[in-house]
From Swiss-Prot:
Keywords: Cytoplasm, DNA damage, DNA recombination, DNA repair, DNA-binding. The RuvA-RuvB-RuvC complex processes Holliday junction (HJ) DNA during genetic recombination and DNA repair, while the RuvA-RuvB complex plays an important role in the rescue of blocked DNA replication forks via replication fork reversal (RFR). RuvA specifically binds to HJ cruciform DNA, conferring on it an open structure. The RuvB hexamer acts as an ATP-dependent pump, pulling dsDNA into and through the RuvAB complex. HJ branch migration allows RuvC to scan DNA until it finds its consensus sequence, where it cleaves and resolves the cruciform DNA. GO terms for biological process: DNA recombination; DNA repair. Residues 64-142 are annotated as: Domain II. The keyword Calcium does not apply. Residues 150-203 are annotated as: Domain III. Residues 143-149 are annotated as: Flexible linker. This is Holliday junction branch migration complex subunit RuvA. Disulfide bonds: none annotated. It comes from Rickettsia peacockii (strain Rustic). The keyword DNA-binding applies. One of its GO terms (cellular component) is cytoplasm. Has three domains with a flexible linker between the domains II and III and assumes an 'L' shape. Domain III is highly mobile and contacts RuvB. One of its GO terms (molecular function) is four-way junction helicase activity.
C-alpha cells in the first residue's frame, strides 16, 4: 500500500493530479483546496490513502496528515464516501470540522452544496466522540510546549505511529515531548525518525 508520494506535479485534471515520481506518473485524487495549492513542475510531498476496489486502486492525496485523518473520519459517517469526503475538505479545513462538530454547528455543513440537513446532523452526531478522541491525545503536549508547526492532530498521529512501531504509549508521548522541547520547529517526518533513532541507541 502506498502511504506517501514525493515528486513533481506533471499535470492536473478536474479532481486529480498526476505526480511524477522518478519517471512514473501516479494519478492521485485530491480536494479542490489541495489542487489549487499545487503548481505544475513543482515538487511536493503528499500523504496518500490507498483504496483498493476489485480491479481498481485509487490514490487520494493530502498535503497534511490532518487532512488524511479527517478524510477517513468523514467516511465513517453513514452516507459519506470518498467523493463527498473530498468535497467537504474542499470547503472546510480539519480545524473547521473539529470546531463545528464540537460546537454542534450543523449549519457549517449545511452550507456545503450536496450536504443536506440530515447528513449535516449525522456528521455532528457521529463525529462528536471521534473528534474529541483525536484531540485529547495530544492537546496536553501542544499546550505545554507551545508547539507552532505541529498541530494536536498531527502530534497524536505521530504518537500512534510510534505505538505501531513498538513503543508503549507512555514511551511515545515522552519521546515526542522530549524531541519537540529540544527542537520546536522539527518536521513530522524528522520527529518520527529521531524518536526511532533515540530508541534504538538505548538498546
Amino acid at each position: 500500500m502506498i502511504g506517501k508520494l514525493s515528486g513533481k506535479v506533471d499535470s492536473q485534471g478536474d479532481d486529480y493530479v498526476i505526480i511524477d515520481v522518478n519517471g512514473v506518473g501516479y494519478l492521485v485524487y485530491a480536494s479542490d483546496k489541495t489542487l489549487g495549492t499545487l503548481a505544475e513542475g513543482e515538487f511536493y510531498k503528499l500523504f496518500i490513502e490507498t483504496h483498493v476496489r476489485e480491479e481498481h486502486m485509487h490514490l487520494y492525496g493530502f498535503l497534511t496528515l490532518e487532512e488524511k485523518i479527517f478524510f477517513n473520519l468523514l467516511q465513517s459517517v453513514n452516507g459519506i464516501g470518498t467523493r463527498m469526503a473530498l468535497f467537504i475538505l474542499s470547503s472546510l479545513t480539519p480545524s473547521d470540522i473539529q470546531i463545528a462538530v464540537n460546537n454542534e454547528d450543523k449549519n457549517i455543513f449545511k452550507a456545503i452544496s450536496g450536504v443536506g440537513a440530515k447528513l449535516a446532523e449525522r456528521i455532528v452526531l457521529e463525529l462528536k466522540g471521534k473528534v474529541a478522541k483525536i484531540s485529547s491525545g495530544s492537546a496536553i503536549i501542544k499546550e505545554s510546549l507551545n508547539i507552532k508547526n505541529i498541530t494536536p492532530v498531527a502530534s497524536n498521529e505521530v504518537i500512534k505511529a510510534l505505538v505501531n512501531l513498538g513503543f508503549s504509549r507512555f514511551e511515545a508521548q515522552n519521546a515526542v515531548q522530549g524531541i519537540i522541547t529540544q527542537n520546536p520547529e522539527i518536521s513530522i517526518d524528522e520527529l518520527i525518525k529521531t524518536a526511532l533513532k533515540n530508541r534504538n541507541s538505548n538498546f
